[in-house]
Amino acid sequence: MSVKVLKRVALCSFACMMAATAVAQVTPYGWRGPERNGIYPETGLLKQWPAEGPQKLWETLDVGKGYSSPVIVGDRLYITGMNEDQTKETFSAYTLDGKRLYTAAYGTPWDQTYPETRTTPAIVDGKAYVISGSGEIVCLSVADGKEVWRVDGGKVYSRKTGNWGTSECPLVFDNKVIFTPAGDVTTMVALDKNTGKELWRTKSWGDTGAYVSPMLIEYKGKRQIIGSTAVHIFGVNPDTGAVEWDFADWGSPRNATGWASIAPNTPLFKDGKIFFGHGYDIHSYMLQLADDLKSVKLLWQNETMDTHHGGYVELNGVIYGSNHHNNSQGTWIGVDWNTGETLFDSNWENKSKGSIIAADGMLYAYNERSGAVGLVKPARDKFEVISQFRITKGSGPHWAHPVIVDGVLYVRHGEALMAYKVK
């Protein structure tokens, strides 16, 4: 029976669909799909688009500036943004035809480079959990956006961040909300999802925070949280907060540049293996988790796939993503899951990079520079773009990861959000 990433986080009608894979109470209401691996459980999607692209159902230009993704729950869409003068981060609710129901301010943005909101909300049992760029974790009612509780990670935990503030989607399961403030006080904390009261905290490495959303896995009948700081990737007991392993033995390739301590992508987990990359011209790595979940060992590293912050997906033994190439000449990559061999290194849209997700056996790539959205047929030897169209509304880098729910592709570009029929 295959092992899957767990996120026991909500209203779990979706769990019935996943019963055969032994994933209990998985929900799609958060970051990069129900398992945080970029794969959306859709069926019957188009395998080719019209020349002009899929049918646009609606667009709105008022979500506020940001790089976060929308979250769809029932007949509502939720998304974070910023107010007009960019002094507050906001949480908004929309109908599924693009009509805004309300907008509520919840936190203080990052006050340096790229201040736009980053947190994709986690929606659980009528509550939204968000983290501001300045490190405030806030619980809101999705009915009206009113605040339920908040914890200031800077004041309470002496949060320590890198150059771009906090970028994390909270992990919510059981009665817990998981947050990674990093710094000298602690690394990761669990808060009561109803009150914000601290339930446990891990030890501290004194490390700077990463830009990684934690995930909950199950392996050999045991659960574990996998998280990251700028230097450490680690596993935590979800009940006690005890750190059960950590890995920071990256060697000289990782320390070769000034960008070595970034960590901008959520890891992939499958069958006891953890794939993780730090981007910024630094190698990616595959770790093997021990059967008792108490240690890891390095299986291989790959010099080509240094994904910036667009994520990666694994399909049929191939890891797909884009690479950084000194932030100017990205390409699209395929790497063998088992061996780490680079299978292809392909140019698309004039040396580009961006985000990638998967659904119904196809890949969806979003070019961060040109705004091209590509429908890609998975292959072991090439990056085969079957159809593509271009996002023309919105402003800034195309950094928000796309989302597919109920046959609709949602693409954000800054203050603009578009919905396309892909079924």
Residue ranges: model-predicted function:
Residues 25-423:
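Noncatalytic, solvent-exposed loop/strand surfaces
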Residues 20-24:
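Sec/Tat signal peptide C-region and signal peptidase I cleavage site
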Residues 1-13:
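Bacterial N-terminal signal peptides that target proteins for export
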Residues 16-17:
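Repetitive helical segments and hydrophobic/amphipathic motifs
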